Amino acid sequence: MSNQRLPLIFSLLFICFFGESFCICDGTVWTKVGWEILPEEVHYWKVKGSPSHCLPYLLDKLCCDFANMDIFQGCLYLIYNLLQAVFFVLFVLSVHYLWKKWKKHQKKLKKQASLEKPGNDLESPLINNIDQTLHRVATTASVIYKIWEHRSHHPSSKKIKHCKLKKKSKEEGARRY
C-alpha cells in the first residue's frame, strides 16, 4: 500500500518545492527581489516589470513557466541537434543511394552500347557467346550420337529377355503338336 503512495508523495513534493522556483512573473517585482525593496523604490533600482502585462492569464502563466526553464531550453536544443543529425544522415544516405543507382545505370548503358556496336575483334562478348553456344551444341550432339551408337550395337537386357521368352513359347507350342 505504501509503495503505491510513494510516487504520489514524491510528485506532490516536487510540485511544491520546484513549482514556484521556475516562474518569476507570479507576483509583483518587489516580492521576488526581496522584502527590503518596497514598491515605491522599484523605479530607483531600475528594475523592469514583467514583459507580459497584456497577455491573458493562461498565456501569461505559460510564458512564466517556460521563461527560465533551462531544462526545457536544453531539451529543445537537444531535439534541434538530433533533428539536424537525422536529416544529415538521411541526406548522406540519399546521396549514396543515388550515386550507386547512377553508377549502375552507367554500367548498364556501357554494356548495351558494347552489345549494340558490332565488334571487329574476336574478343567481343557477342562472338564469345555464340562460340560457347556452338560448343555446347556440338558436345551435346556428340554425346547423343555416342548413346545412340551404344544402344544400336548393344541391345538392352529387356529386349534379350523378351526375345528369349518368345523363342521358348514357340518351342513349347511346337512340342505340343
Swiss-Prot record:
The keyword Ligase does not apply. It is found in: Membrane. It is a single-pass type I membrane protein. Residues 155-168 have a biased composition (Basic residues). It comes from the Eukaryota. The chain crosses the membrane at residues 75-95. InterPro entries: TEX50 (IPR038833). Keywords: Membrane, Signal, Transmembrane, Transmembrane helix. Residues 1-23 form the signal peptide. One of its GO terms (cellular component) is membrane. Residues 155-177 are annotated as: Disordered. This is Testis-expressed protein 50.
